[in-house]
């Protein structure tokens, strides 16, 4: 079974690669990496993985490698339209007589469009999207201007399934330490922790009532593994193309509550004098983090039904709340707030 993977040194892709290689060392895997330094990171942990050098704009290379593959996993960028088109072009040109499989990564930021359109930040929402009863809403009902939607539509444009069968995995707020060869850190909660430590207090957008959904990176990787295994079994029990949309979640979070958890953890670990949380306007948050108003202030709620029903997938890793202390400590170390750590990290100790 030949796989071509994009994003192997990223947070999502690195952990997914770890999960797949651990269970299926027999797979013939080729990874796109940007440069020899990135390649060396992969080669140390996965010497059997073949490396090709380029980036997401290396469309001819992506077409060529996709044409050679049975399965392509795009873990690299939910917003790179040219790369998605190149993958589909390559898979469509395969001469094997069987369909090639594309497993693409989107993100539940796509669900923020209502709040973004109405410029509502910090308030709650009752709308919960799902990938079973309302699957067609995710295929045809999301407006074109929603985040990630342009590339979702490219992937969904392959409808007959004769040459290409596609599945979109749509993860929410991802947390937990990755196991990959490159980046092992997520964005939303670590960025909140970093700015909390910088400001000396917790950061809440507006009333702090905003809902998101959460998933541990290890549980997300398990879904990628199950989809790859299904693809390797001629599609298996998975659904593809018009029904190939998979949320991946383990429940809701409320950003105001997360802000308090981060502040309490920072105080408990001695990085802040108190555990106070301050309310910020979207404009104030934007000065700290360009996407902060959306990441911590817009609603994005979903339910992962399809993977559970069809693939037997379930989440089993620790909750986000259980990982807060480790996240805060990691960011504190990066910022040199842990005595001696900055010198060790710089090689001066």
What are these regions (language model features)?
Residues 152-180:
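Conserved beta-loop-beta element that borders a ligand/cofactor-binding pocket
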Residues 27, 317-349:
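Amphipathic terminal alpha-helices
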Residues 89-150, 167, 177:
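Conserved Rossmann-fold NAD(P)-dependent oxidoreductase catalytic core, especially the SDR/UDP-sugar
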Residues 2-26:
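N-terminal Rossmann NAD(P)H-binding glycine-rich loop of SDR-like oxidoreductase domains
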Residues 237-238, 245-301:
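Terminal hydrophobic/aromatic helix or amphipathic segment near a protein terminus
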Residues 33-94, 106, 110:
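NAD(P)H-binding glycine-rich loop region in Rossmannoid oxidoreductase-like domains
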């Amino acid at each position: 079974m030949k796989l071509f993977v994009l994003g192997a040194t990223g947070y999502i892709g690195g952990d997914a690669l770890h999960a797949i290689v651990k269970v299926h060392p027999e797979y013939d895997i080729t990874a796109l990496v940007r440069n020899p330094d990135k390649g060396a990171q992969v080669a140390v942990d996965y010497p059997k993985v073949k490396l090709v050098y380029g980036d997401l704009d290396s469309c001819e290379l992506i077409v060529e490698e996709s044409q050679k593959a049975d399965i392509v996993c795009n873990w690299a960028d939910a917003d790179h339209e040219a790369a998605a088109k190149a993958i589909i072009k390559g898979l469509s040109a395969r001469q094997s007589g069987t369909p090639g499989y594309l497993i693409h990564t989107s993100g539940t930021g796509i669900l923020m469009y209502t709040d973004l359109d109405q410029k509502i930040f910090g308030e709650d929402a009752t709308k919960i999207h799902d990938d079973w009863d309302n699957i067609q809403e995710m295929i045809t009902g999301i407006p074109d201007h929603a985040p990630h939607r342009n590339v979702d539509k490219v992937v969904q444009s392959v409808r007959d399934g004769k040459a290409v069968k596609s599945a979109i995995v749509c993860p929410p707020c991802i947390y937990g330490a990755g196991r990959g060869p490159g980046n092992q850190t997520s964005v939303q909660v670590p960025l909140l922790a970093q700015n909390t430590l910088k400001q000396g207090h917790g950061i809440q957008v507006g009333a702090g009532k905003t809902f998101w959904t959460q998933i541990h990176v290890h549980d997300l990787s398990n879904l990628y593994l199950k989809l790859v295994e299904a693809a390797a079994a001629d599609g298996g029990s998975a659904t593809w193309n018009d029904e190939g949309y998979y949320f991946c979640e383990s429940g809701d979070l409320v950003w105001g509550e997360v802000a308090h958890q981060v502040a309490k953890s920072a105080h408990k670990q001695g990085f802040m004098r108190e555990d106070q949380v301050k309310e910020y306007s979207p404009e104030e948050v934007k000065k700290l983090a360009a996407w902060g108003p959306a990441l911590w202030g817009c609603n994005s709620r979903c339910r992962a039904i399809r993977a559970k029903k069809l693939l037997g997938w379930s989440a089993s890793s620790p909750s986000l709340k259980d990982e807060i202390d480790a996240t805060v400590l990691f960011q504190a170390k990066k910022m040199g707030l842990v005595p001696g750590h900055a010198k060790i990290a710089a090689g001066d100790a």
